[in-house]
């Protein structure tokens, strides 16, 4: 674990550069940054980045740096142009478990040099502390830190030309998206009830709750265009155009019943491919939708009767199987966990 300690921070002068130090620390593999001077605005900026882009990076300001450095259990490294070349000591530093990396803003006190186990330079020429931290972390992790993936609300899609960002909207943003597509009260009431059922399932089934929440609220957005069997496909197309995360798009596309097979899709006049839910989030949203009629929660028997009355025997069996699968993972019958909603 690598902790970055930033000392000499002056909020009126260093806010931008210290923010960059924090962002580099997060992006290049450190787990946290501690800053000596209290700066709530800087803390909130970094926390917002973590919230939007993912990860578990920690930031805290207002730390008494000297006592923090002395009490740190691990290897203490002071990055300075006056230190030994990084190539000479990096293997020794790697042998430690927890590493504290000190990055100074203004002139670093001599005490920091004396407390540090290593005074390390990436070059003995004047340079930016942001660059020094990036190079140190890259040498420490041998470039593997750049392979780390993050699951956030905002996900950058690598492009050769242009730029593309996919979003995981929160609950309020989902409702705004629905209203922007002129969803009526019937749709809103229905998806809000499906959301309640889906999130109750998510309480006992390991899953990505962000995807379940967004998928549940957006699953019927296609009904703003059509109420036919192709409304799920229409909804997926709407969300694609809005750069919504592909995992949510697939939840919406595959939410009908317990899914539609490619053979059934062909008979129904849909683009021929499988629309059967695969991920646990897709299954949760699909079945939460099954258990809601308009804005009323129903049980499995009522659901099965509805399908059997329409002579949809195969679809009814798939729904029953999906109900049993999710109930098994939950450890309780889903009818039991939703009856008090």
UniProtKB/Swiss-Prot annotation:
Domain HD: 187-294
First-level EC class: transferase
Reaction equations catalysed: cytidine(56) in tRNA + S-adenosyl-L-methionine = 2'-O-methylcytidine(56) in tRNA + S-adenosyl-L-homocysteine + H(+)
Positions of S-adenosyl-L-methionine binding: 79, 104-108
GO MF annotations, alphabetized: tRNA (cytidine(56)-2'-O)-methyltransferase activity
Compartmental location: Cytoplasm
E.C. numbers: 2.1.1.206
Gene3D superfamilies with a match to the protein in the record: 3.40.1280.10, Hypothetical protein af1432 (1.10.3210.10)
Keyword RNA-binding: no
Main location per the UniProt record: cytoplasm
Classification via CDD domains: aTrm56-like, HDc
Tagged with keyword S-adenosyl-L-methionine: yes
A Gene Ontology cellular-component term: cytoplasm
Any single biological process term in GO: tRNA nucleoside ribose methylation
Family listed: Belongs to the aTrm56 family.
Function summary: Specifically catalyzes the AdoMet-dependent 2'-O-ribose methylation of cytidine at position 56 in tRNAs.
Full protein name: tRNA (cytidine(56)-2'-O)-methyltransferase
Organism: Picrophilus torridus (strain ATCC 700027 / DSM 9790 / JCM 10055 / NBRC 100828 / KAW 2/3)
Source taxonomy: Archaea, Methanobacteriati, Thermoplasmatota, Thermoplasmata, Thermoplasmatales
